[in-house]
Structure formats: C-alpha cells, structure tokens
A protein has these predicted regions:
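Structural recognition of the beta-strand scaffold that forms the well-ordered cores
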Residues: 34-39, 67-72, 122-126, 167-171, ...
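Secretory targeting signatures
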Residues: 1-28
Length: 393
C-alpha cells in the first residue's frame, strides 16, 4: 500500500510538473512597437497637444500590441509622462516643470522608455515648432531648444546605455526634412520622417496612424514610414486644407553616399565659381523656399534635388552635368517615400523631399549653422561652397 501511494504521488507530481512547464514556456509575446512622443507644447501650440494625445487614444484598438508613451509639457503647466491606451490616458509620472529644449531631458525620456517599454521596434516623434537645421522643441519657459546635434547627442547616449537604435525619428514639426538634419542623425536612427514645408497646428493624423498600427502591429519600419507619409497628406487633402503640405521618409543608410556626391558637386562648383556663379544664382532662386517665422527668424532653404536639376540643365560643362546627375540619383535613393499637395498654387508643386540651407548672401547667413549641425559642417564641403559663392558675388 505504501508503494502504491508512492507511485500515485510520483504520477501526480509528474503531471503537475508537466503542466507547470507548459505554463512557464508560454511567455507573452514581445510588444511589437513602442511609439514615444516628445510633446513640447510649452508655447503657443499648447491647445494642440491634448488634442493629439486624445486622437492617439481614440485610434488605438483595445488590446493593441503597441506601447504609446507621451512626455507632454504644456504652457504654464507641469509636465506629465503618460501611457496612452484605447480611450484611456494614464499618468505614469508627474514631473513638474521640465526643460524640453534640453538634450538631457530628451535623453532621460528615451532611456526611460527603452528600459520600461521594450519592443521590437521604436519610433520617436519630436512634436513642436521646427526650424530645420536650427532644430526643434522650443521651450518658452527656458528659452532653449533642441538642435539636430543635441538630438544626436541624446540618442547616442540612449543607444550606448541600452544597445538599441531607434528605428524611426519622426518630426511633427515644420521644416525638418533637411539634408543637414538627416546627416546629423545618420548614426542614431534608420529612418527620418520630416517635411520640407510648414506643418499645420493639427499636425500628424494620430487617430488614423494608431488605427493602422493597432491593426498591423508587425509592420516593418519602412512600410510604417510610408503609411505615415501617405496618411498625413491624405488627411489634409480630405480636409480640403489651404496649406501646402509635404512629408518625406528618408533612408539614413543612404546618407553617406549622398554626402559623397554632394561634396563632389559642391567642390566642383567652388573650384569653378567664376563660370558657375550665374547658374548657381538662377538655380538657387528657382528652388528657394523662404519662410518668415516671426521671432524664430527667416529661413532660406532650397530643394536640393531641384537645385541640382537646374544646374544640370543650365551648365555647359559635362563634369557639372555628371556630378549633378549623381547627386540627384543619391537623393532619389535616400527619399523612399514622399507626397505633397499644393492647393494654393503659389509654389512649385514639384517637391523632391529634402531641402538644404542656402541664404541669398552673407548678411542673411547665420553662424549658428556651424553650431547646430556640427557634423554636417565639419564633414561636408557645402559651407565652403556658400562662402565661396558669397565672396564671388
């Protein structure tokens, strides 16, 4: 009888252990995406911040395999860290006043999210006013903002801490679809999403973006980037918006090849400035986009592809023709998604996805350029072309 009991107990134990092993092996699947939003509404965009967060919550489906984490700082209000789910916005942390224009704040946010909300893929959305090479996220309480170099510094720190590279850095901010911005971020992200143009206050269409991500949690970063570009432009087209809107998705792996072609193109123009200065002036004028941004200054950016295309058409120089064509091909390779609408008809409807800084003269040039995009200035010869052109004209 004792032996029978032992056998029975052994059988029960074996059964329980087998059941337990099944439970342990059934680990929950890793979250597919973490969508982190660095939402700096500490300025006149304050009303749009809560609106966009609500759109995220509305768009997320119940049980979506997605983390949506938002750091929002509003005008004259403390900052909060939120976890957004279907029809719910939960406060994770109350942070008091924070400086959204500090790279330290951005680094803290990204590191916190990487630690607490790990996923297969990550998107960082930088939300606020944008100024192209000058940066993004102007904090009116501190007076500071994030330059592209600051963003690179923060993301480098986060990557070194957690060995994770952000898949997509998106800018829900004006004018950030620039060569200089992409160059500065080439080592810290795989894809940049940004606009050559101004972005309306309503920003990205977060409800439909979250609906898509909820329904397609295993989407790859490239496909997701294309979807964001398409949805953004469709959103304003359906609104019958009066805004010229444009958005690009850029493959950061292609930046070094583009920079090499840009250097060769710029060097040849600089070395032949006396014969090229006239066509440079014509091409610059035809491709310029001038933006007057109140206290944020005046921006003189040109569509780089269009600039090279006009140089190619006007130059009576086979070398210039070849170098311009090479640059155009590299830009085409970088910009893997682009869309725009031009309801006003007062701008050239053809946009190619990337601008570059080219003020009309030395008086309009800002020396801040050399500080805000340090890597680009040091490692390319574009600035040398600008200075050579200014001296010659």
């Amino acid at each position: 009888m004792k032996g029978a009991k032992i056998v029975f107990i052994a059988l029960v134990a074996a059964f329980l252990l087998s059941e337990f092993s099944v439970v342990v092996s059934a680990k929950p699947s890793k979250t597919s995406w973490t969508f982190m939003v660095y939402l700096d509404a500490d300025n006149n965009l304050d009303p749009y911040g809560p609106l966009n967060v609500q759109q995220m919550s509305t768009g997320l489906m119940p049980g979506a395999n997605v983390n949506v984490i938002v750091l929002m700082d509003r005008l004259d209000q403390p900052a909060y860290l939120y976890k957004v789910t279907h029809d719910s916005v939960e406060v994770i942390l109350s942070l008091g006043e924070v400086d959204m224009g500090s790279s330290k704040t951005l680094a803290w946010f990204v590191k916190y999210v990487l630690k607490k909300y790990s996923a297969e893929h990550y998107l960082l959305d930088l939300w606020d006013h944008g100024g192209g090479y000058r940066g993004v996220c102007w904090d009116e309480s501190s007076g500071n903002h994030l330059s592209p170099h600051d963003i690179e510094t923060a993301l480098t720190e986060a990557e070194q801490n957690y060995q994770v590279k952000i898949d997509i850095v998106g800018f829900d901010a004006c004018l950030m679809g620039m060569v200089e911005v992409c160059y500065e971020l080439k080592d810290v992200t795989n894809i940049v999403i940004g606009s050559e143009m101004l972005i309306p206050g309503y920003g990205w269409p977060y409800e439909s973006i979250m609906q898509y991500l909820s329904a397609n949690p295993n989407v790859d970063p490239c496909t997701f980037s294309k979807e964001i570009v398409e949805q953004y432009v469709s959103y304003y087209a359906n609104m019958k918006s009066a805004y010229f809107v444009q958005l690009s998705a850029i493959d950061e792996a292609k930046v070094p090849e583009m920079a090499e072609s840009l250097n060769a193109f710029a060097d040849h123009l600089s070395q032949n400035i006396d014969t090229c200065k006239g066509i440079i002036a014509d091409a610059r004028g035809a491709s310029q986009q001038k933006f007057i941004m109140g206290t944020m200054g005046v921006y003189y950016y040109i569509d780089l592809y269009k600039f090279a295309e006009i140089i190619k058409e006007k130059a009576e120089d086979e070398v210039v023709d070849m170098l311009a064509l090479n640059l155009m091909k590299e830009i085409d390779a970088m910009v893997f998604a682009e869309d725009h609408i031009n309801p006003q008809g007062n701008l050239d409807a053809k946009q190619f996805g990337l601008t570059i800084n080219f003020p009309p003269n030395l008086q309009a040039y800002s020396s801040g350029y050399e500080m805000y995009v340090q890597c680009f200035v040091k490692e390319t010869t574009w600035l040398n072309l600008l200075m050579t052109y200014y001296k010659a004209t």
